[in-house]
Regions:
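Sec-dependent signal peptide hydrophobic core
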Residues: 5-10
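Extended, compositionally biased non-globular segments
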Residues: 288-344
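Positively charged n-region of N-terminal signal peptides that target proteins for export
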Residues: 1-4, 20
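Extracellular/surface-associated beta-sandwich interaction domains
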Residues: 2, 26, 34, 207, ...
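Compositionally biased, low-complexity linear motifs
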Residues: 173, 305-309, 361-369
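Short, low-hydrophobicity acidic/polar segments
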Residues: 22-237, 279, 283, 289-301, ...
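C-terminal motif of bacterial Sec signal peptides marking the signal peptidase cleavage site
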Residues: 14-17
Length: 385
């Protein structure tokens, strides 16, 4: 089952006398659940409302991994789907929300309350001839974010380039309006606008289902069955693990043609893959060494690493495990190949435990087990000599 993260967005509108440019602020009344300020007024403005569906998994606020909403900051777009617009430009009504910052509050226990997303108060334009689709992405990038470079909007595509160190949990989602009947008759309503919520039969607040775009790897170290200590001054340590993956990725947030929505690919201009060290925090500091002799059971190495997957063709990851005996010993790298049973592919939105069993300086056993985000089968054991 794919785990999605939902937040609810009510369409927005302005009074009919207002212009058809991007949404603006306007005082609101009590309104109904879809944001219509005065349901008895056929020309009532419709407020943009943001909320979130319920999730039951806790998340540590300091980590990049998102399992539930907890003051999570996302970027939101509302863009015209109409064929009249070949691209989205300021001033022509095709952009309702552009990289709008939204905060999904959540609850202390990790569950989510409705209307938990906070943005500046916005309304739809008063005319009803433009139909919008909503898009969201995480982590948010803008002038007031850690990443100050916002997404680009060029040639009918909104894209964001992420430079990653393994801590970034990149997510994306969209909400496309379902065709519904007009209470007054005539053509069905197709696309979020003021009329959709004023006159739509059974109009529902838009849901954006965020999905993880990367694969999560969790490294664990343990003693192999044949492990024996060489003495207190020759304790064996795993000092570093490197994954061969892509350090820069391009996420398509919105594509006017509709073919690339949500796609994530390596950045062409950066080049190929690189060896990225397993880290211990969002700052990108290398994970602390683990002394194998002292392990009782297993020991986590670093923190969760989010890495790119090519989908069906990503059946392996190459990595290096660095070993050192004693404080003055030579550091030796041991290449490993991480793979799943039956050559299954590593999937976005899934979490895998990579269990490394150390026998000696030149013998490492590896297996990977799928956990957390989505459950799945265990991976086959691999022994590297």
């Amino acid at each position: 089952m794919k785990k999605n993260f939902l937040f609810v967005m009510a369409a927005a509108a302005m009074l009919a006398s207002c212009s058809k440019d991007a949404a603006v602020s306007e005082p609101a009344g009590t309104g109904n659940e879809n944001g219509v300020v005065d349901p008895t007024d056929p020309n009532s403005p419709v407020l943009v409302r943001l909320g979130a569906g319920g999730l039951g998994v806790d998340v540590t606020p300091t980590r990049g991994v998102v399992d539930s909403w907890n003051n999570t900051v996302v970027g939101i777009y509302a863009l015209a789907k109409d064929a009249d617009f070949t691209e989205w430009q300021a001033g022509d009504g095709s952009i309702l929300l552009e990289n709008e910052k939204g905060t999904i509050t959540g609850n202390p226990d990790g569950s989510v309350i409705k209307d938990a997303i906070t943005i500046a108060e916005k309304y739809y334009p008063g005319n009803n001839d433009i139909h919008y689709t909503f898009y969201g992405y995480y982590p948010y990038a803008g002038a007031d974010a850690d990443d100050t470079t916002p997404p680009t909007n060029e040639n009918g595509k909104v894209t964001k380039t992420f430079t990653i160190n393994g801590s970034q949990d990149i997510m994306w989602g969209q909400a496309v309006a379902t065709k519904i009947n007009n209470k007054d008759g005539g053509e069905q309503l197709d696309g979020y606008n003021a009329l959709y919520f004023r006159k739509g039969q059974d109009a529902a607040t838009p849901d954006i289902a965020f999905e993880h775009k990367l694969t999560q790897l969790n490294f664990k170290i343990k003693k192999a069955g044949e492990f024996s200590t060489a003495g207190p001054d020759k304790q064996l340590s795993v000092t570093k693990i490197e994954i061969n993956t892509f350090p820069s990725l391009d996420l398509t947030i919105a594509d006017k043609a509709g073919t690339d929505n949500g796609n994530i690919v390596p950045t062409d201009a950066i080049g190929g893959a690189a060896d990225i060290p397993v880290i211990k925090n969002d700052a990108g500091d290398d994970a602390d060494a683990v002394i194998v002799d002292n392990i009782d059971g297993e020991s986590a190495f670093g923190t969760s690493m989010m890495v790119y997957t090519a989908g069906e063709t990503q059946t392996t990851y190459s990595a290096k495990v660095y070993l050192k005996m004693g404080t003055d010993g030579e550091e030796v790298s041991s290449p490993i190949t991480i793979k799943l049973a039956e050559d299954a592919a590593f999937e976005a939105g899934k979490s895998y435990n990579v269990n490394i069993a150390v026998n000696s300086m030149m013998k490492v056993e590896v297996n990977a087990t799928l956990t957390k985000w989505q459950p799945g089968d265990d991976a086959e054991d691999i022994e590297i000599n």
